[in-house]
A protein has these predicted regions:
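Transmembrane helix-loop-helix hairpins in multi-pass inner-membrane proteins
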Residues: 1-41, 92-204, 282, 286-345
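Membrane-helix interface segments
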Residues: 10-11, 47-49, 78-87, 117-119, ...
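Membrane-interface helix starts
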Residues: 13-16, 45-53, 222-236
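Membrane-water interface at transmembrane helix exits
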Residues: 29, 40, 69, 73-77, ...
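A short amphipathic helical element positioned immediately N-terminal to and/or at the very start
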Residues: 37-45, 213-226
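Hydrophobic alpha-helical transmembrane segments
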Residues: 51-55, 82, 86, 123, ...
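Membrane-embedded helical hairpins/re-entrant loop segments and their flanking transmembrane helices
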Residues: 64-94, 252-269
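Transmembrane helical segments that form the transport core of multi-pass membrane transport proteins
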Residues: 221-272, 280
Length: 345
């Protein structure tokens, strides 16, 4: 795997991405203009401590992602520290936004390569981290659905009735991704299918690259999945990360005094919201979440209320997190400048 796969975002691309982010934010604010009075009134009710509590829960997400990276990378680099894991988490969050969703893994690979992890294993481990995340999202939403399916069926109308269909489509995609990582049978099937690519130089080069990535992924998945205690730790951290994220809308609703929805009901709705957002297009993590949030929570809150909750939710889970990741990213660069890369263990 070439070192081109691991890179830092350039200043030019970062500036363009920030302008796109600003434009998207302006579009979202414009769509909220008819309910701006309700939104500002709801936000004005919040105390300083309530705002700080919501922001703290939002910041916990990238911190726990860093903990997951720490646990995963230590399977290859036993000397990999928690601080370095947090650096990887910040690099992923920052890279995902400033490259409009395309650069989280390359930025993480750049950091991991600098601390001594070869690019191939690094790419395999970061892909497996993504697979663990998607698997946990699927399991979390499935458990919530099984426990509260009767309540959801009795309280959904309109487009929400299509939610099971969307769930099934996304579930199939996630299961296929998991099987590609862990099943030798599916990996062999993928190799066979790649043989049908056009016999041109361009496509054959792509085929060679994909086969190399598939081989690395197969090797790293066997190594990681053989360590059952480590896998359980990863799943536990992923579940805790999602639990905190799914608590955010409940805190927003409660602090604003907007709805009688119960804690576990909001957990269900938020897990489904995140699940549905995976099937929607997004730019730098924006667009899909907002659409899915309005779709899911719009059946349980008034229009102005759901927009108020969405506004605070995105401030805590996206904008403040991105601002923190910018600081974390530059601190990570300082850490790299202060160390010599260790040898692989």
């Amino acid at each position: 795997m070439s070192q081109a796969a691991a890179q830092q975002p350039s200043r030019k691309k970062t500036a363009i991405s920030l302008l796109v982010l600003l434009a998207l934010t302006c579009i979202i604010v414009f769509t909220f203009k008819d309910h701006w009075a309700e939104i500002t009134a709801a936000l004005a009710q919040l105390s300083v401590w309530q705002v700080l509590a919501v922001l703290a829960v939002g910041i916990s997400y990238p911190l726990l992602e860093g903990c997951v990276a720490w646990v995963i990378v230590r399977s290859r680099l036993p000397q990999f520290t928690l601080r370095q894991g947090l650096d990887v988490g910040w690099c992923g969050t920052f890279g995902n936004v400033v490259t409009l969703g395309a650069g989280a893994v390359p930025v993480q690979l750049y950091y991991l390569h600098k601390v001594g992890l070869p690019l191939g294993p690094g790419a395999g481990l970061m892909t497996l981290e993504y697979v663990f995340h998607k698997s946990t999202v699927l399991l979390y939403a499935t458990v919530m659905l099984l426990l509260q399916r009767r309540w959801l069926a009795a309280n959904t109308t309109g487009v929400m009735r299509y939610l099971p269909m969307a769930y099934a489509v996304v579930a199939v995609i996630i299961v296929a991704l998991v099987l590609l990582c862990v099943s030798p049978l599916v990996q062999n099937l993928a190799r066979w299918l790649l043989g049908f690519l056009p016999k041109t130089e361009k496509w054959q080069q792509r085929r060679a690259d994909w086969l190399e990535q598939l081989e690395v992924l197969s090797t790293e998945s066997r190594r990681l999945l053989a360590d059952k205690p480590r896998c359980l730790k990863i799943f536990a951290l992923q579940a805790l990360k999602l639990f905190g994220l799914f608590c955010l809308p409940y805190l927003c609703i409660r602090f604003m005094g907007l709805s009688p929805l119960g804690f576990w009901q909001v957990q269900l709705l938020t897990s489904l919201m995140l699940f549905v957002s995976n099937a929607l297009p997004n730019v730098a993590g924006m667009g899909s979440i907002e659409t899915a949030f309005l779709l899911v929570f719009g059946s349980f809150l008034e229009r102005g209320e759901v927009m108020s909750v969405l506004m605070l939710y995105r401030i805590a889970s996206y904008y403040v997190v991105f601002a923190a990741s910018a600081v974390g990213f530059f601190i990570a660069q300082r850490h790299l400048a202060q160390m010599e890369p260790p040898k692989e263990g």
